[in-house]
């Protein structure tokens, strides 16, 4: 489709702290750079692929961290956009776990990070209170602010999986 495209996996980019971040996939085409971050989260299931092979999927669980990590990818792509030569990037999630795209409306400490169908995320994102009314603290997963606003619009991949793509 794009034979002139250069594709690199796990490409390092400098970050604002003087270190490096690694981007899952980077496509370079006609002088433009398109960074892509991927998340693949599964719920335990046995599925049959297009060739008839049976595949056992593991349960990743920790939906709260999966949502956080997806939005943190968007944050990282926003920051990268400010320091690198690219006009747009993409955050992509593929999952068979409806906990990501269904809004249960059950109050939880990760309400600010939920990525259910129709949710809009932007600005300051932080953890809320636990069911005991205490501030949730997660080492290594702190608050952050998104510059843009992103609508979560899930799409059907097949009868098992759905995917989410946000352009940054």
Predicted features, each with a name:
Residues 55-68:
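Surface-exposed cleft-lining segments at the edges of enzyme active sites
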């Amino acid at each position: 489709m794009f034979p002139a495209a250069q594709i690199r996996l796990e490409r390092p980019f400098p970050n604002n702290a003087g270190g490096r971040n690694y981007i899952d996939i980077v496509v370079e085409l006609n002088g433009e750079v398109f960074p892509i971050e991927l998340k693949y989260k599964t719920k335990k299931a046995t599925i049959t692929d297009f060739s008839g092979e049976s595949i056992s999927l593991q349960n990743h669980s920790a939906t709260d961290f999966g949502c956080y990590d997806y939005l943190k990818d968007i944050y990282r792509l926003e920051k990268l956009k400010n320091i690198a030569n690219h006009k747009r990037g993409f955050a992509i999630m593929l999952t068979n776990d409806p906990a990501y795209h269904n809004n249960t409306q059950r109050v939880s400490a990760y309400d600010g990070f939920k990525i259910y169908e129709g949710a809009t995320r932007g600005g300051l994102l932080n953890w809320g209170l636990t069911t005991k009314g205490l501030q949730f603290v997660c080492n290594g997963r702190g608050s952050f602010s998104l510059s843009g606003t992103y609508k979560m619009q899930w799409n059907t991949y097949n009868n098992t999986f759905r995917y989410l793509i946000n352009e940054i």
